[in-house]
Curated annotation (Swiss-Prot), chains A, B:
This is Recombination protein RecR. Keywords: DNA damage, DNA recombination, DNA repair, Metal-binding, Zinc, Zinc-finger. HAMAP family: RecR. GO terms for biological process: DNA recombination; DNA repair. It comes from the Bacteria. May play a role in DNA repair. It seems to be involved in an RecBC-independent recombinational process of DNA repair. It may act with RecF and RecO. Gene3D superfamilies: 3.40.1360.10, 6.10.250.240, RecR Domain 1. InterPro entries: DNA_Rcmb_RecR (IPR000093), Rcmb_RecR (IPR023627), Rcmb_RecR_Znf (IPR015967), TOPRIM_dom (IPR006171), TOPRIM_RecR (IPR034137). Belongs to the RecR family. A zinc finger (C4-type) spans 57-72. One of its GO terms (molecular function) is DNA binding. The keyword Zinc-finger applies. PANTHER family: RECOMBINATION PROTEIN RECR (PTHR30446:SF0). It comes from Albidiferax ferrireducens (strain ATCC BAA-621 / DSM 15236 / T118) (Rhodoferax ferrireducens).
Length: 196, 196
């Protein structure tokens, strides 16, 4: 068998990636060493730089290398709309639609009482301060449609409802391209309720 | 959206891993930055060290940090048996069985004429020299049971058959734990032929 030490260390390190077990990690390690050493070094540098330089935007909490992220600084953005998402990945999905031109607030988590994650841990105070800065007129709740995401949206709407803001939630409904026959009943029920 | 630059560079670098597309790469990057920065730095170091230090054993061509790997140097190994495998991952699978105590020769590839990979590219000359060193008495062909693996085994057996060595191939047969009803016919036919 190939020597232990640095190969094993690499396999163990790759296993820390989400969704990567020991088999995938071995395959990745062997691939990089056998076919793509420049790729291994590029990944090494990229990890180092990102872990060193990435921090949170002071306004929206997303990842950025500057104090304030490019989205928050963009003057073409509609500052009267604030879209609340759980993670930068969710924000990125919304951005890729090209259908939203307001600003964001990234919670970097969600309420999850079972895991001991309460309102303080996801910085709801910061969100409430931001939403009540006088510029924001509409808060769009775009947390996920999971139990935790719904609970998070509920707590935020409770916290903001007396502040004179317009509070909206992403529409629940039938996914584009799908056939009713195969859509789950809860989704169809919501699509009926929210028909327009 | 989160700033480009070092986050995007990281996502692109992660995409060079086998089996990782842009969605998985984003998830990995966000996970490391959000929840496991020590993991990101550990992976960065492990990649750097492995890419710098890993080279091929002079005797068996597997990955090692020394000139000659620990397996080749182990005096308890039976040097009269030489098992030919395609990759260190295959070698590792054989080692984990605990059923083999001979030495290895790792081709680091397989014949693949369609990809322009011929006998010279996978170092068959080195294998032939090694097999005819006077110590080796049996060569066990453990290349994969794919078209390329079978072709590789065939070429090796042709090259070695006049040298007075015992040439064997891993048995083809019904996998342990499986039911005949669900095993493919080619495998059952081989299991019949190779019955003992």
């Amino acid at each position: 068998m190939a020597d232990l030490n640095s190969l094993d260390v690499l396999i163990q390190a790759l296993r820390r990636l989400p969704g990567v077990g020991v088999k995938s990690a071995s395959r990745m390690a062997f691939h990089l060493l056998q076919h793509d050493r420049p790729g291994a070094l590029a990944l090494s540098r990229a990890l180092q730089v990102a872990a060193d330089q990435m921090r949170h935007c002071e306004r929206c909490h997303t990842f950025t290398q500057a104090d304030i992220c490019a989205t928050c600084l963009d003057p073409r953005r509609d500052a009267s709309k604030l879209c609340v998402v759980e993670t930068p990945a969710d924000q990125s999905a919304l951005e890729r639609t090209g259908a939203y031109h307001g600003l964001y607030f990234v919670l970097m988590g969600k309420l999850s009482p079972l895991d001991g994650i309460g309102p303080k841990d996801i910085g709801l105070k910061g969100l409430f301060d931001r939403a009540c800065d006088g510029t924001v007129q509409e808060v769009i709740l775009a947390t996920n449609f999971t139990a935790e995401g719904e609970a998070t949206a509920h707590v935020i709407s409770e916290g903001l409802k007396s502040r004179g803001l317009r509070l909206t939630r992403l529409a629940r409904g039938v996914p584009v391209g799908s056939e009713l026959e195969y859509v789950d009943l809860g989704t169809i029920a919501h699509a009926l309720l929210d028909r327009r």
